[in-house]
Amino acid sequence: MKTFSAKPADVTHEWFVIDATDKVLGRVASEVALRLRGKHKAIYTPHVDTGDFIVIINAAQLRVTGAKSTDKIYYRHSGYPGGITATNFRDMQTKFPGRALEKAVKGMLPKGPLGYAMIKKLKVYGGAEHPHTAQQPKVLEIAGAAK
């Protein structure tokens, strides 16, 4: 019997919605990365995008454990000398809710064309509303509540 290898035309991408209220950032990010890659499916093939679409709502209410809200630092550089900027998690969540989650998930995905296609299937919204109701996403529960 030959080893099964999924073809891009044979893969169906489902839509899921996750409510991130009071969930821990890393636990949500790891589960989302696993589902974006498609590793939860029996037809997983490393060189084919077998993952699903993930819509995350209430990303502004994500939590981190310990003192990471002030200690976790995100860096970016403008490209000019001395152009490095540092932002902690609390300020990032205030200005751009959901960007910390996007960065965490992006770091867990492969780098290259396939990884870039996977991250495009992630939709993050700070509030409870999202424009993807036409896709009829299924509710996905993640056990990552902060204690």
Curated annotation (Swiss-Prot):
<dbReference type="GO" id="GO:0003735">
    <property type="term" value="F:structural constituent of ribosome"/>
</dbReference>
<dbReference type="InterPro" id="IPR005823">
    <property type="entry name" value="Ribosomal_uL13_bac-type"/>
</dbReference>
<comment type="subunit">
    <text>Part of the 50S ribosomal subunit.</text>
</comment>
<dbReference type="GO" id="GO:0003729">
    <property type="term" value="F:mRNA binding"/>
</dbReference>
<protein>
    <recommendedName>
        <fullName>Large ribosomal subunit protein uL13</fullName>
    </recommendedName>
</protein>
<dbReference type="InterPro" id="IPR005822">
    <property type="entry name" value="Ribosomal_uL13"/>
</dbReference>
<comment type="similarity">
    <text>Belongs to the universal ribosomal protein uL13 family.</text>
</comment>
<dbReference type="GO" id="GO:0006412">
    <property type="term" value="P:translation"/>
</dbReference>
<dbReference type="InterPro" id="IPR036899">
    <property type="entry name" value="Ribosomal_uL13_sf"/>
</dbReference>
<comment type="function">
    <text>This protein is one of the early assembly proteins of the 50S ribosomal subunit, although it is not seen to bind rRNA by itself. It is important during the early stages of 50S assembly.</text>
</comment>
<keyword id="KW-0689">Ribosomal protein</keyword>
<dbReference type="GO" id="GO:0022625">
    <property type="term" value="C:cytosolic large ribosomal subunit"/>
</dbReference>
<dbReference type="Pfam" id="PF00572">
    <property type="entry name" value="Ribosomal_L13"/>
</dbReference>
<dbReference type="GO" id="GO:0017148">
    <property type="term" value="P:negative regulation of translation"/>
</dbReference>
<keyword id="KW-0687">Ribonucleoprotein</keyword>
